[in-house]
Amino acid sequence: MALWGGRFSQESSALFKLFNDSLPVDYRLVEEDIVGSIAWADAITGVGILSQQECQSLKQALQELLAEVKDQPETILASGAEDTHSFVEQALIAKVGDLGKKLHTGRSRNDQVATDLKLWCKKEGKALLELLAQLKAALLSLAERELDAVMPGYTHLQRAQPVAFGHWCLAYVEMFERDISRLQDCLQRLDTCPLGTGALAGTAYPMDRYALAKSLGFASPTLNSLDSVSDRDHVIELCSDAAISMMHLSRMAEDLIFFNSGEAGFIELDDQVTSGSSLMPQKKNPDALELIRGKTGRVYGSLMGILTTMKALPLAYNKDMQEDKEGLFDVMDSWSICLEMAALVLSGLKVNRENTLSAAQQGYANATELADYLVAKGMPFREAHHVVGEVVVEAIAQKKPIEEFELASLQVFASVIQEDVYQCLTIDSCLAKREALGGTSLTQVKAALAAKG
């Protein structure tokens, strides 16, 4: 039975019911709806709508229903109710009779769903903070495990300068720490309770909304009824936070997919996060990482979907806003599983140190060191840059690394070059000189690890 039938003389068409009903999506809010209803029972008791005995009867029935839906969630969808609010009210009436019809006094599904959704977002947001922390810990563990492994750093996907593998790990730690900060900010902003604002104009009953908000674990009540029931900023912000974090996950996945390729051979992924080919028996595919990269697109799509849905809605509530949940639920599910999977990938990852070191020694990654050496000898950097470019051209022609040139050959390009140049061209020297804060020297990487730990 619908909650709004008195105004209508005809039944809804079967097609409209299928089109209109939201239970197949919003059933995930049923626990929050019951918790909110328990708090509402106390609130309307405080203004004389319910007696203490009636309140206790309703709360007991709601607690029973909460246990039932946790134990047998399939009963929700089997009910045929229009939405999660209708399911709860119908189940309550089945338990306590006409008393159940009093619970909705002073309340609208508009403030009800806004409250349910915020409660759900708070719960899921806290779970995601834990997953982000676990991923950060996995990166720190990998950085410590492979602290002194050396690999080429890239710009334009070309070898640029040698870096410590731990430095690469710590770059993603920085990204995921920003994700944590953004999510914490979002959870702080959404921590206001809409319950008690009615359909749009506020409730007619003089209840203490501060006490109501506190009883549900919110920091405070919302302050404008029109905004309360039409606000979905928290949905947009969570989707945005997820999109940025998924971008970070996708970039990390792309790096690791390349590192894992036969062309690079820098790492080996554990069997438990890879799969094979139905035709080619030799294949070991990085499917976990590719799926992280692939799921990023659907998260972006959901963000654009809710932004587009909300962009032209007049105040206050509109049925369009029923479309806020499907995308949000998918975003949070996708973000969650990708964070878990990324941590699992990192936990079993092995670095092929010989390959990473060999790659770091190729591609003239020490060319910048030679330029810095010339600057130390008094040559202006722009001139030094040009001279080293000429050295690299000659090195490519001779198919040999810079450090294998004889001193006399190097002095053809710059007479200030002396025997001590060879000390500057080693991989160890390249790393050790990056001592400034945020650099890739082992001293800096160790300090960064200690600070993050």
Swiss-Prot record:
Q: Give a GO biological-process term.
A: arginine biosynthetic process via ornithine
InterPro entries named among the record's database cross-references: Arg_succ_lyase_C (IPR029419), Argininosuccinate_lyase (IPR009049), Fumarase/histidase_N (IPR024083), Fumarate_lyase_CS (IPR020557), Fumarate_lyase_fam (IPR000362), Fumarate_lyase_N (IPR022761), L-Aspartase-like (IPR008948)
EC number(s) from the headed UniProt entry: 4.3.2.1
User: Which cysteines share a disulfide bond?
Assistant: none
Q: Which GO terms describe its molecular function?
A: argininosuccinate lyase activity
Name its pathway.
Amino-acid biosynthesis; L-arginine biosynthesis; L-arginine from L-ornithine and carbamoyl phosphate: step 3/3
**In its UniProt entry, what is this protein called?**
Argininosuccinate lyase
State the species of origin: Shewanella loihica (strain ATCC BAA-1088 / PV-4)
Q: Which gene encodes it?
A: argH
